[in-house]
Amino acid sequence: MNLIDKKFEELKIKGKKAFIGYTTFGYPTKGETLDYIKLIYSYVDVLELGFPFSDPIADGEVIQRASVKALKEDIKLDHLFYSIEKFKKDKPIAIMLYANTVYKRGIEKFFKDCKDFGADAVIIPDISYEESAEFKAACRENGVHYIDLISISSIERAKMIAKTSKGFVYCVTRKGVTGFKGEIDKSIYELLSELKKVTSTPLAVGFGIKSKEDVLKLKEVADGIVIGSAIINKIDEGKEDLVSFLETIRSVL
């Protein structure tokens, strides 16, 4: 069983929701990144590790800034895989990266490396559902979950995608990029309600979730909460503030 499936089953039995925490690999520096990753990993249920890219179209200002800084650290994909192998324990890890990085390594080799080094899932935000077949086939071959991103723009399209989704369905809480500072779009509640009619795959929500209040609103309808930009901001403020934030979110999930 994929570790993501196992984790969501465990949480369901306990009546808990998944804390899915994101950070950018290589941030804030090449030397410090593993310490921060281990710290975040100790609080979350699922770790989402972003691999930096020069044109991250789905990412907002905060994660773009983290990616730019990480790229200056001369971060390589091999560094990411070796680090996962080094620190991973009993909780799942998802890699978030852009398609060009996968193509550069080769689709077959990339997903075999995911299996061999311990990545449980992959999120590729610039590949549409219609373009994902080759990636999903490689995932199945290696026991890795391909996580579908679903937006609030079309409920019927979202339902079509969710019917075949694996691991968890990543539901975007609003139109736009990560870290958006506005209010959560209320149509996310309708979307989640409709998706539950067509899939038993866990539903996770993300993009712009930044506070305990946001989490409390969404945890009643979602199976998991994804937080990224807010974690990056707390890294900038220092480990004490980061730990306080992680503890706060952990306490309400």
UniProtKB/Swiss-Prot annotation:
Keywords in alphabetical order: Amino-acid biosynthesis, Aromatic amino acid biosynthesis, Lyase, Tryptophan biosynthesis
E.C. numbers: 4.2.1.20
CDD domains tied to this protein: Tryptophan_synthase_alpha
Catalytic activity: (1S,2R)-1-C-(indol-3-yl)glycerol 3-phosphate + L-serine = D-glyceraldehyde 3-phosphate + L-tryptophan + H2O
One GO CC term, this protein: cytosol
Enzyme type, top EC level: lyase
Pathway: Amino-acid biosynthesis; L-tryptophan biosynthesis; L-tryptophan from chorismate: step 5/5
Signal sequence, start to end: none
InterPro entries xrefs: Aldolase_TIM, RibuloseP-bd_barrel, Trp_synthase_alpha_AS, Trp_synthase_suA
Active-site residues from the entry: E48 (proton acceptor), D59 (proton acceptor)
GO molecular function, one term: tryptophan synthase activity
NCBIfam families, per the entry: trpA
Role: The alpha subunit is responsible for the aldol cleavage of indoleglycerol phosphate to indole and glyceraldehyde 3-phosphate.
Subunit structure comment from the entry: Tetramer of two alpha and two beta chains.
Similarity section: Belongs to the TrpA family.
Database matches in HAMAP family: Trp_synth_alpha
Name used for this protein in its record: Tryptophan synthase alpha chain
Species: Caldicellulosiruptor saccharolyticus (strain ATCC 43494 / DSM 8903 / Tp8T 6331)
Encoding gene (name): trpA
